[in-house]
Every structure is written in C-alpha cells, then in structure tokens.
Regions:
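Residues located in well-ordered beta-strands
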Residues: 169, 181, 195, 244-246
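C-terminal boundary and immediately downstream tail of ABC-type ATPase nucleotide-binding domains
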Residues: 175-198, 226
Length: 314
C-alpha cells in the first residue's frame, strides 16, 4: 500500500483517544467523513449548499446513512449532544460510527477500548463483535488484553519486539503455542514453568518422578517444561509418577480455585480445581501432582518447540 495515497486506501481508523471534534454534535461527528468526501467546498456552505439541487440530494443520502449507523450503534437518543455531554461508552460508539458510516474495506482499531472501565469494556467488546458479524468487514484490532483478543478475533497475530511470533485461531494459540513467550502471553492467570537440564532422552526426571513429555523426547538440550493450571491434578502422594507437593495457599475465583503448591524440586506450581474440592484442602497438606503429559510442553532453551501440527500457519 506504500504506493497508494492515504485518501485512496479506503481504510477507517478507530483510535484509543476517540479523536472526536469537541465542537460538533454526535450526528455531525459521524457525518464528517461523508461530508468531506461527497460534498464540494461550495456545497458544504450552510446557505449556498442548501440551494444547490445536487447538494440537497447528497445531503439526504448522508443523513440516511448517518441515521442507519446511529440505529445500529443505539445512539439515536444522543445525536444532538456534543462529546463533553456523552459517557465514555457513547463517545467510543460515536468514534466507531464515524468509521463505519464510510463502509470502508478495512477497519483499523488501535486499542479502542483501553479508556473504558471494566464493565463498559466488556459491553462494548460484545457490541464490536456483533457489528463485525453483521457488517462482515475485515478488521485489524490492536490490543494488549489477551481476553479481548480471544473474544473478538477469528485469528490472532502475537508480536514481540515488532516480530510476529505466531498467527493462529485463539483456541490453537492456547493449545499449541510456538514458543514460551506466546504460552506466557496467553496464560490466564498462570503458567507453570520448570527449568530442565538436558539431554532429555526418553523423558524428564523431576525429583523422584519420571515424566514423559512427547515434545521433549530425544532432545539433546535443556529447556523449560510448561503446563497450564488445568492440565495437572492433585492426587494421593503415593501415586506412581506423581510429583510430591505441599499446599501453600489457595485462591478462590468463583466456582474455581487455584492451589499454590510447593514442589520437592524447589518450584511452586498452580493447579486449578473446583472451589468445592478446595474447601477440603488445608495449608501444609502433602499431595501428589499428576501432570497431563499430552498437554504439557517442552520449550528448548535455543528457541521454538516442535509443535504437534502446523494448522496455525494455514
């Protein structure tokens, strides 16, 4: 697109700061891009423009499109208000409306929800998802919020230091991360990690336990064993193959609970269980930790792991 003038790219931006005209009403803010694109400088004059037949017809078309967009965003009741008289959510919807009314080929949204409080962010996120489904317009949405990205995206591109590390569907990123940074980025709220020295051979020896991790088989170097809190379970301490852990503390999160357990190898792991079961545990209790070897990952110290499939690149 470098050779295409910005005015000819047919892109619409939505900014974090809204960038609304403070002296214009919500209606005029939404209509602004249409007025600038479809009316000449003479036709935009309040008195003379009203006398020109072509301008009258185009103004009628602009009004129709603004009101259609307003209805879609549920802004009809505030069209006559200026930005200072609008709530944060209403301002954000006006900014969305200003981008949508043009019907561009691509939307570019740069953290448009960052200035909203938590409840309003979730509500507006749902509205954006609904609008995207109804309009079907390609949208590039920049965010540092993992939950926001997963909720809104068909595909996510994860970047670190200006470099794209992985592109995939949200579920595939969570299930099959390309490297440790991607796995950490999608950790909600925790990722269990354990440094492992190589060579690995036929499995990982952790304390008195032998763990077979398919990713690690045959590795000639060390790295990091990683797994999510839901990919391990607390079992009887004498279960074969289980790591020995001791309950340090418990955090409750609604119907779930997170158990922080100190392992014999000097690491602390976090395991997700039901809140009901957590009530039967006590601090200092000795238990076994059974890691799901099919869902754990081994990340070599020299870079990306060998993923189990390459559907992320399709």
């Amino acid at each position: 697109m470098d050779a295409v003038a910005p005015k000819d790219r047919d892109l619409a931006f939505v900014f974090q700061s809204y960038a609304l005209y403070p002296h214009l009403s919500a209606y005029d803010n939404i209509a602004a891009p249409l007025i600038m694109r479809e009316l000449t400088s003479v036709e935009r004059l309040p008195v003379i423009g009203a006398l020109l037949p072509g301008a009258v017809q185009r103004n009628r078309s602009i009004d129709e499109r603004v009101r259609q967009t307003s209805a879609l965003l549920k802004l009809d009741a505030v069209l006559d208000r200026r930005p200072a008289a609008l709530s944060g959510g209403q301002r954000q919807r006006v900014a969305l409306g200003r981008a949508m009314v043009r019907k561009p080929k691509i939307f570019l949204m740069d953290e448009p929800l960052a200035n909203l409080d938590a409840a309003l962010r979730i509500h507006t996120r749902s509205e954006i998802a609904r609008l995207h489904k109804e309009m079907g317009t390609t949208t590039l949405f920049v965010t540092h919020d993992q939950a926001e990205a997963a909720a809104l995206s068909d595909r996510i591109a994860i970047m670190f230091g200006g470099e794209i590390r992985q592109v995939a569907k949200p579920a595939d990123l969570y299930r099959d991360p390309a490297d440790l940074d991607v796995a950490r980025f999608l950790a909600q709220p925790f990722l269990n990690e354990l440094a492992v020295t190589g060579p690995i051979g036929g499995g990982l020896t952790v304390g008195n336990s032998r763990i077979i991790i398919r990713d690690a088989l045959g590795s000639r170097e060390g790295g990091t064993l990683a797994f999510r809190p839901e990919h391990a379970s607390l079992v009887c301490p004498d279960q074969p193959g289980a790591l020995q852990v001791q309950v340090a503390r418990i955090e409750y999160a609604g119907t779930d609970a997170y158990v922080f357990a100190d392992a014999e190898v000097g690491a602390q792991f976090v395991i997700r269980i039901t809140a009901e079961r957590a009530q039967s545990l006590r601090g200092g209790e000795s238990l076994g930790l059974d890691i799901d070897s099919e869902k754990a990952w081994f990340f070599p110290s020299n870079g990306s792991r060998q993923r189990r499939d390459h559907s992320w690149a399709a």
